[in-house]
Structure formats: structure tokens, C-alpha cells
Amino acid sequence: MKKILIVDDEANNRLLLEEILEDFKGKGVEIFLAKNGKQALGIIISERPELVFLDIMMPTISGYEVCDIVKRELKLLYIYIVLLTAKGQEEDKHKGFDVLCDRYITKPFYFNEVIEIAEKVLGIKVS
């Protein structure tokens, strides 16, 4: 079973992304939600999702830190991490790619972009 993890400290953002990705559930994809970096790491370690949509600005452990831990410390390079953020400055993007994120999307994002990423990473067509 393929798995997606959505990580954001704002409940509305988590629910919006889950709604955008709802059609994947009908294709056997399990969607997990986390409200902070600590929860995200726990789910990543136990569930090994193929795809993570990860907010950057969160209390305690930032999205940058989560990405760095997943890619460098845990060596889970196969997990496709999309950093989602309102921070659109070039230096912010560079920092994201420095911690080995696979994609960097600024909010507000296009729904189709999120769906296309999930289709590509999971190899499942829903649109």
C-alpha cells in the first residue's frame, strides 16, 4: 500500500491537502496527518511513506530539520519530500534543497500541482 504524509501545524492546511488528495484513497493510498515535526518523524519511521508534504515553519522542529533528519541521518533518500511554505525567497529555496528536499512549493499552491506530484511519485493516475 502506498502512503502519503501531510505535515502542517495549521489544521486547515492539513485538511485542505487531505481533501485535494482524497481521490488517491480510492486507489488504495493511505494518508497520514501530522501537526508537528516530532509527530512527522514518528510516522515516517513507522510507516515509511513514499511522499511527504511538509510545512517549513512549525514550532519545535522545522520542516527543514525534519527533511534533513530523514534524508541525512535516517538515509531514507527514497522518500519524496515536498516542502510547502509561504517563504518564497530564493535563499529559502536554497536552504530547502540544501537539506535535500525533492520539491519546494510556495503557498498558495495550485491544487493540480499537488495532484500531479502525487501521481508522478506514486505512479497512480487520478485526474
Where are these regions (language model features)?
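Alpha4 helix (beta4-alpha4-beta5 surface) of REC/receiver domains from two-component response regulators
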Residues: 65, 88-103, 112-119
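Active-site beta3 strand of CheY-like receiver
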Residues: 47-53
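The feature encodes the CheY-like receiver
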Residues: 59, 68, 77, 89
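Helix N-cap/capping motif at the beta->alpha junctions
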Residues: 33-42, 63
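Conserved sequence signature across two-component system core domains
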Residues: 7-8, 34, 52
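A Lys-centered signature of the CheY-like receiver
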Residues: 107
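Two-component/phosphorelay signaling modules centered on CheY-like receiver
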Residues: 11-32
